[in-house]
């Protein structure tokens, strides 16, 4: 059992390190925020639990896409200014309401369409509170997911670990009351 944990730790170390190095280098090359906080959590899932539906590229791309879209709409609707320190703004309540509404809607949408990806919740908050925003930032978020998926595929191919691109919708259904 310890050998399996060592192999998993090694795969996480190599995969996460390589993915962040590639995404970071591309971020510098194109002067765009490809290396944003939630992509680190996505990378961990890709290399720690590659067979899980929440780790597959389908869920990562659609989850982050839903989060970015809903976060953008909430920020626009509530007048949250992108790239403004929301706690220092004159009306910080706007960002709080934007975050609450956006995460509720994005979470429900991911659950409804069976594309759950927990790090996408962080993306939703990042965009809804104005830390990132605008078409260029949204493109960077989705571009980073594509690059992460490609690095994940490459690393898993060399390791012999299966990494499905499009996992079937098998996220467990929550229990009914």
Regions found by a protein language model. Name each.
Residues 101, 105:
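Membrane-embedded alpha-helical segments that form the functional core of polytopic membrane enzymes
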Residues 35-40, 117-123:
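Transmembrane helix boundary and interhelical junction motifs in multipass membrane proteins
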Residues 75, 109-113, 122-129:
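Generic transmembrane alpha-helix signature in multi-pass membrane proteins
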Residues 51-60, 109-120:
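Membrane-helix interface "capping/anchor" motifs
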Residues 114-122, 159-164:
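Juxtamembrane/interfacial segments flanking transmembrane helices
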Residues 23, 106, 124:
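Generic structural marker for isolated residues within well-ordered, non-membrane alpha-helices
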Residues 88-91, 106-112:
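Short acidic, glycine/Ser/Thr-rich loop/turn "cap" segments at secondary-structure junctions
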Residues 1-81, 86, 90-96, 100, ...:
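Alpha-helical transmembrane segments and their membrane-interface boundaries
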């Amino acid at each position: 059992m310890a050998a399996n944990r060592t192999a998993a730790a090694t795969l996480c170390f190599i995969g996460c390190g390589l993915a962040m190095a590639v995404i970071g280098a591309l971020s510098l090359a194109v002067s765009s925020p490809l290396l944003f906080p939630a992509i680190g959590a996505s990378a961990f899932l890709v290399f720690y639990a590659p067979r899980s539906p929440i780790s597959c590229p389908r869920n990562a791309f659609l989850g982050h896409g839903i989060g970015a879209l809903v976060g953008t709409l909430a920020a626009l609707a509530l007048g949250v200014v992108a790239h403004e320190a929301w706690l220092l703004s004159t009306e910080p309540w706007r960002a709080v309401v934007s975050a609450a509404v956006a995460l509720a809607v994005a979470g429900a949408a991911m659950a409804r369409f069976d594309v759950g990806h927990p790090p996408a919740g962080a993306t939703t908050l990042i965009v809804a509170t104005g830390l990132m925003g605008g078409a260029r930032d949204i493109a960077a978020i989705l571009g980073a997911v594509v690059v992460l998926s490609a690095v994940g595929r490459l690393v898993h191919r060399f390791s012999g670990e299966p990494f499905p691109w499009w996992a079937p919708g098998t996220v467990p259904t929550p229990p009914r009351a």
